[in-house]
Amino acid sequence: MVEVQASLAPFINQEFVVTGAWGEPRSGHIHAGIDLASLGTGSNAQPIYSMSDGIVTRVDQTDQGTGYGAMCIIWNQNNNDLWLYGDLGDNSIPLTVGQTVQQGQQVGVEGNPAGTASTGLHVHLEKENQSDGIFKFGYNNSIDPTTGTGILNEVYTSSDEYYIYDGTPIPPSAEEKKGFNWPVFTKVIRERNNMGGFLLWKKRKWKN
């Protein structure tokens, strides 16, 4: 196997693999997201972290008949990206609707919901871009969630690459710098918090 350093991921300092690709045929539908699973952790569900700043628009602590299991949706109002984190562990989401979230903040843990096309503990990651902040659901409304992350949209086999992400945020693009109050991470504080999860960061604001 070959380790690849991803530039953005819902796992931090944890090896993981792709177990379900975006756009692959499923029973009666096309997979609108990508499934990612921690590697080498057995039955220990690993923390899942937000891939962007944003506002929480939906929280389901258990499956509400959607097929997504426990899930949350975060809307980045600066670029209108909506990220759905599905198939999380029941009652593991430490968020409420309307809450502001920062990139790298924990949104839950991996789950293995009954009644889904599950491949063991994993997170289902789905992405849309909607100016109204409303997640529309379905493959036709989705965009490839691996774009710009360094993760290939290909299901893992034992001879394939696996990934690890160390928590270093992607610098904002020139277009993003024009936005209001875009944070940029300028100094890494090499200290882990007591949740065992992610690196802490000192922030400043871009000056237009």
Language model features: what each stretch is:
Residues 31, 50-94, 113-127:
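Zn2+-dependent peptidoglycan hydrolase active-site motif and core
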Residues 2-14, 40-42, 93-102, 124-187, ...:
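Acidic, glycine-rich catalytic/binding loops that coordinate metals and/or anionic ligands
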Residues 193-194:
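Intrinsic-disorder-associated, low-complexity terminal segments enriched in Asp/Asn/His/Tyr and depleted
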Residues 46, 81-84, 141-143:
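Short beta-strand segments
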Residues 1-70, 79, 103, 158-175:
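Surface-exposed, glycine-biased beta-strand/turn segments
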